[in-house]
Structures are given as structure tokens and as C-alpha cells.
Amino acid sequence: MTLLKYATYLAVLAYGGRLVGRTMDNEYRHFLNIWMKARGSGKSEDNQLLKRYDFDLEGVHADFHAVRNEKLWYHRGVSVQGSPVLVGAAYYAVHAFGRHMLYPGSVSLFNWLLSGSLITARNLMVSAKNGRRAWLRTTEGDLIDTMFIRGEDGTPEHRHRTLVISCEGNAGFYEIGIANTPAQLGYSVLGWNQPGFGQSSGLPFPNNTLAAADAVMQYAQSVLGFREEDIVLFGWSIGGYPASWLAANYPRVKGVVLDATFDDVLPLAQARMPKVLSDVVEYAIRAHFDLDIQAIIAQYKGPLKLIRRLQEEILTTDESGSEVQRRASNRANFLLKRILQQRHPHLVVDLESQVDRWLAMPPQQRAMAGHSGNDSEIAIRRSRLYAACDHYLTDFDATHVQPLDPGYFNIPLPFHDLK
């Protein structure tokens, strides 16, 4: 009890000292006056004054309110059944540790540890790149923190006219995330933090994440003024989930780039949990976090590019085998095969093993394999299958978390030769 008492005294002294210090600081008092005015008025001009400062967003007014759209499509997986014990165990697992494992970026401690870096990067975006910060209210009630950076005029191919919406991974933030890659190339970019990440409120359950993604898309069109066909969706890792869902609901987008993205989160979850808990994991995923990207991206028929990491350590399910076996277990491979089956089923029939063969080839061998001198029907079909693989997937020799080299970010084009 004595230790607890002294700890309480120290906490009171620390917070009391901070309060006194802030009230004596002229700049802080000026910020407080602006914050109170903005909170009371809700006017856009007051919000803009408030954005000169970096602070906890609790209590601020949103710059944009998303409109509920009843026509949006949602993936409805198979109905899962289970005993009361299984249901209860799965619910406990999801809320006790499952969500934290799936989305570590939403953990308070993780956010606190990165807060200094995020503030510095955010301020740099505004001061050095003329970033435009906006707070969006989703239909689920969450406040989503976003940053828009317009590309400079005079870029090749008028890239500034194309908006890249970046969808970060499970520990990614727009301040230090994938938006930097297309920004370096001159594209306009719109980054956003998922619910519970950085200054965004809420938690990243599927409904909240998709509502946030739709709010970002609505904002991009109605406020920033980009047409649907001028928007590229760029998802990294688990960010492929909201990116694919947006593509399914906004099919006229210019293209979709999925970097280090899996087909379905279930095999990855089961590979990292004890086999004795397999049933609990399956129920928990299907009932609470059914991130079945392969089923979602099937709704989209437009330009698509997958980027596979050759040194992938997160999306593999075989950690004990050789390098060849580990690479073969990369779930990006399964996503490619599913896309080929969906878009070009006539090419894959009886040749699915050839996709695995192509995935295992080095670049030089792929180039030779794609130009067979054999005119047989099977050889021609195999050659066209290899061409499809090459069109949809690019290899990047890097680990899962290494930033994507700008040279590998290419907006995909439609593939007309394989109808």
C-alpha cells in the first residue's frame, strides 16, 4: 500500500506540474482558445486554424461526414456454426488478444511508442509537401485522420492528375507508410489511418475499416474533386482488404496495386497458432475477421497488379522448410492463382501446376519459357498462361516490411490479349 501511495503522489505531481507548465505557456493558451472556439462553432475556418497544432483529436469537429450508401457490396462468407463453448472461446480470443495480433498498430502502447515519429513526419508533410490534413466522420461514427498531398504540375504523364489512395498494413501509418512511394513519383496521394491507428478513433473491426475506406473514397471524389477513373487503390499487406473492397464497389477506378497481400487470413492465422486451437481460430476468423481478399477482389474486373516479396517472412506458412518451400508457401502465390482462375479459367484448366512452376522460376528462365517454339495447343496455352502470370504479378526482392522501391510501383493496364 505504501508503494501504491507514493506512486499516486508521483503521478499527481507529474500531471499537476504539466498542467501548471501548460497554463503558463502563452502558445498553449492560444491553442486552447482556438480549440475551444473550433469545438463550439464547428466552422471549417476554425478547424483550419486548429490544424496548425498537433494534438489529441478527441472532441474536434469532422471536416467531412460520409453518407451511408445502402448499395455497397459486402462479402458474406459461409455461415459458421459452433457450440456455445466454441463461440465463447472464439469471442474471448478475438477481444483478449486476437485483434491485437492481427492489428498491432491499434494497440495503445504501440501508438504511444511511435507518437513522436508520427508527429514529426506529419508536420513535415504539411510544412515541406503542402499536405492537407482532414478529419472524416465515418458512418460507423469513427473519426479518421487523413493527409492529402497533391503532386506537382509538370510530372511525366500528368501524374498529379491521378490520385493514389494508400491502404496501410496492420502496423502501418500514413505518416511513415506506403504513400511515400507514389508521392516520390509525382502522383497525388491520399493517406489515411485505420480506426485505432495514430489519431484515428475506433477499432479496426471489419465494418469499421470498410466504413473508413468508403469515407476516404467519398472525400476523394466530393471534396478533392478526383473522378473515380482517376483513382488508383494501393494496398500493402492487410491493407489489401479495404483496397480490394473499394475496388469491388468502385469498379471504374484506374487500377489496383496490391503489395505483399495474401489471399485469405485464415491459413496465416492457423499457421501461427497451436493446432489444438485450430477450430477456435477458424470460428474466430470467419465470425469476426473474415478477411477473404481473394473472394472480394473477384468482384473487380479492372487493371490489377500484385507485388510478391521474394524474402517474405510474414505471408509464408512453411517456416521450417527450404527457401524454395518457404517461397512456395507465400500466400501471394495463392492469390495469383485465384485471380487467374477467376479471370482466365480457360487458361488454367489442367495447367495450375504450371503457375507454380512459373512462380519458382528466376526472371531469365521465365523469359525463355514464355517463347516456346512448339505450336501445339497445350504449348500455346501454356505460353499465354505465363504471359498472364507476368502481367498480374511482379517480384520484388525484399522482406515484407521493406519500403517498396518506386521503380516497382507501376499503374496496371488492362489485359486485352487473354479474353
Place the predicted regions along the sequence by residue.
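Glycine-rich "HGGG/HGxG" loop immediately N-terminal to the catalytic nucleophile
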Residues: I176, G196-N208, P267
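Alpha/beta-hydrolase active-site loop
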Residues: L203-G225
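N-terminal targeting or regulatory segments adjacent to alpha/beta-hydrolase or S9 domains
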Residues: M1-R122, I411, F415-K419
